[in-house]
């Protein structure tokens, strides 16, 4: 059996636009509903969503049945043990939060690579199909997509250095935490924050790496794409469910009491 090729990593390297969707429900059943929707990629959120290793595994399994949809996973932190566990589950693309410096980015890359280029521990796991991919240890490093999140003022000051780290495939701008870091908590739409986001997208692209971002606002998604974003998540399952169920209930409440 041949180790799988990471189509998402290839698309980022080629600068091909990838439209995605955020999974925060922590549920494989709803993840499969989204996997068939037509998105290029889905992000399984292990930082803010109620996840554990088994819930992430279940979502990787159901999304894996949809060949045109790639599963990426956000780890809860840059902890090397956590990164190893998520990679062993079979995640090929990781999003690592709160990376502020080039040294931190380089440490993330090392955690994702086997020796001698890194420190990832070797063990029989789903990623190698329990040894059925005979060359997995030799091929895995080239197929792991490493994306780090720049989401503080400090990260923006180090953006080029972070992007230029060998092994970093993309830099994702975390708009909510960035807004808080810049003094506008809860207001990523503030003009100063938006200017910083657009500037960051262009700087990452100029450094030769793929910039990414998340927004459930369609006009902003289009703006980010126009300013160089390569991979954009255009919605969140929890946000969409809350918004649409509230709107539906409100419409029928008006009918009931009219």
Curated annotation (Swiss-Prot):
<feature type="site" description="Transition state stabilizer">
    <location>
        <position position="74"/>
    </location>
</feature>
<protein>
    <recommendedName>
        <fullName>4-hydroxy-2-oxovalerate aldolase</fullName>
        <ecNumber>4.1.3.39</ecNumber>
    </recommendedName>
</protein>
<feature type="binding site">
    <location>
        <position position="177"/>
    </location>
    <ligand>
        <name>Mg(2+)</name>
    </ligand>
</feature>
<feature type="binding site">
    <location>
        <position position="176"/>
    </location>
    <ligand>
        <name>substrate</name>
    </ligand>
</feature>
<dbReference type="GO" id="GO:0016832">
    <property type="term" value="F:aldehyde-lyase activity"/>
</dbReference>
<dbReference type="InterPro" id="IPR050251">
    <property type="entry name" value="HpcH-HpaI_aldolase"/>
</dbReference>
<dbReference type="InterPro" id="IPR015813">
    <property type="entry name" value="Pyrv/PenolPyrv_kinase-like_dom"/>
</dbReference>
<keyword id="KW-0479">Metal-binding</keyword>
<comment type="similarity">
    <text>Belongs to the HpcH/HpaI aldolase family.</text>
</comment>
<feature type="active site" description="Proton acceptor">
    <location>
        <position position="48"/>
    </location>
</feature>
<dbReference type="InterPro" id="IPR005000">
    <property type="entry name" value="Aldolase/citrate-lyase_domain"/>
</dbReference>
<dbReference type="GO" id="GO:0005737">
    <property type="term" value="C:cytoplasm"/>
</dbReference>
<comment type="pathway">
    <text>Xenobiotic degradation; biphenyl degradation.</text>
</comment>
<keyword id="KW-0456">Lyase</keyword>
<feature type="binding site">
    <location>
        <position position="151"/>
    </location>
    <ligand>
        <name>Mg(2+)</name>
    </ligand>
</feature>
<feature type="binding site">
    <location>
        <position position="149"/>
    </location>
    <ligand>
        <name>substrate</name>
    </ligand>
</feature>
<feature type="binding site">
    <location>
        <position position="177"/>
    </location>
    <ligand>
        <name>substrate</name>
    </ligand>
</feature>
<keyword id="KW-0614">Plasmid</keyword>
<dbReference type="Pfam" id="PF03328">
    <property type="entry name" value="HpcH_HpaI"/>
</dbReference>
<dbReference type="InterPro" id="IPR040442">
    <property type="entry name" value="Pyrv_kinase-like_dom_sf"/>
</dbReference>
<dbReference type="GO" id="GO:0009056">
    <property type="term" value="P:catabolic process"/>
</dbReference>
<dbReference type="GO" id="GO:0046872">
    <property type="term" value="F:metal ion binding"/>
</dbReference>
<dbReference type="GO" id="GO:0008701">
    <property type="term" value="F:4-hydroxy-2-oxovalerate aldolase activity"/>
</dbReference>
<keyword id="KW-0460">Magnesium</keyword>
<keyword id="KW-0058">Aromatic hydrocarbons catabolism</keyword>
<feature type="site" description="Increases basicity of active site His">
    <location>
        <position position="88"/>
    </location>
</feature>
<comment type="function">
    <text>Catalyzes the reversible retro-aldol cleavage of 4-hydroxy-2-oxovalerate to pyruvate and acetaldehyde.</text>
</comment>
């Amino acid at each position: 059996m041949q180790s799988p090729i990471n189509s998402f990593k290839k698309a980022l390297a080629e600068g091909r636009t990838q439209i995605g969707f955020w999974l925060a429900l922590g549920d494989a059943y709803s993840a499969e509903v989204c996997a068939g929707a037509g998105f290029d990629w889905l992000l399984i959120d292990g930082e803010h969503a109620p996840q554990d290793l088994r819930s992430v595994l279940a979502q990787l399994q159901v999304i894996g049945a949809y060949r045109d949809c790639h599963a990426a996973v956000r780890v809860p932190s840059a902890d090397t043990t956590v990164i190893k566990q998520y990679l062993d589950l079979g995640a090929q693309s990781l999003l690592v939060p709160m990376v502020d410096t080039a040294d931190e980015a380089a440490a993330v890359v090392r955690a994702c690579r086997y020796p001698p280029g890194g420190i990832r521990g070797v063990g029989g796991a789903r990623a190698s199909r329990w040894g059925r991919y005979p060359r997995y240890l030799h091929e895995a490093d080239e197929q792991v997509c490493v994306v780090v999140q720049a989401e503080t003022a400090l990260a923006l000051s180090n953006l080029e250095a972070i992007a230029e780290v060998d092994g970093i495939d993309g830099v994702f701008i975390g708009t909510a935490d960035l807004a808080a870091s810049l003094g506008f908590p809860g207001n990523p739409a503030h003009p100063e924050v938006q200017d910083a986001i657009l500037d960051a997208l262009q700087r990452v692209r100029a450094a030769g790496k793929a910039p990414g971002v998340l927004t459930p606002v369609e006009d902003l998604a289009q703006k980010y794409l126009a300013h160089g974003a390569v991979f954009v998540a255009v919605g969140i399952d929890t946000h969409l469910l809350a918004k649409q169920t509230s709107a539906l209930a409100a419409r029928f409440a008006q009918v009931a009491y009219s």
